[in-house]
Amino acid sequence: MNHVQPMIHEDGLPGDESRLEPRPEWRPKYPGSGRLEGKVAIITGADSGIGRAVAALYAREGADIVIVYLLEDEDAEETRRIVEAEGRKAIVVKADVGSKKMCDRIARQTIETFGRIDILVNNAGEQHPDEDITDISEEQLLRTFQTNIFGMFYLTQAVRPHLKSGAAIINCTSVTMYKGSKDLLDYSSTKAPSRPSQDHCRKISSAKASASTP
């Protein structure tokens, strides 16, 4: 498989996808079959990358989408246009999932707009490549855990009272959880908790819970 090296790359966090050249490929390449017709999905980190691709695919399958993002307004609005082009409704919610208060607001806005929550995709994540463990600052360590672990818990707590039988919680994890990474020690350390948390969700609620490794 040939890989195209981008002419322009984005080192900032979160990345501004609108600046990339060539742009990442996200378009669904199959006709939808209505498998998510009438469902409402909250997708964190949906302004770009995996989150945008999931939003596009879910919309094609019939779901309305709550696009949760941190900073990149232009990217989030483009994801909204993508969803609406599929004939579905979308709202954008600018929020830091590392804040419990903001996670509560995400759930509240979803219920106020759509009246239901059927799917939660905990996709938002933060990673900072470092050559050595001594390069990881206290601020970076706290921020990575706040986003990747606390955010998953906070938002799952916020949507839990609104989930009915057949609902789904999807936690996006990483191959680094299994293999480790010499450059992403703090990031890979935050991915392991997604497995026990999903097992707990399955046992105490009516929602399906799964971990996805992109």
Where in this protein do the model-derived segments appear?
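Amphipathic alpha-helical dimer-interface segment in Rossmann-like NAD(P)H-dependent oxidoreductases
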Residues: A56, R108, E112, T147-A167, ...
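Active-site helix of classical SDR
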Residues: T156, T190, Q198
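Conserved mid-core segment of classical short-chain dehydrogenase/reductases
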Residues: V4-Q5, P31, S99-D104, E112, ...
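Conserved glycine-rich Rossmann-like NAD(P)H-binding loop of the short-chain dehydrogenase/reductase
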Residues: A63-E78
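Canonical Rossmann dinucleotide-binding motif of NAD(H)/NADP(H)-dependent dehydrogenases/reductases
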Residues: G34-V66
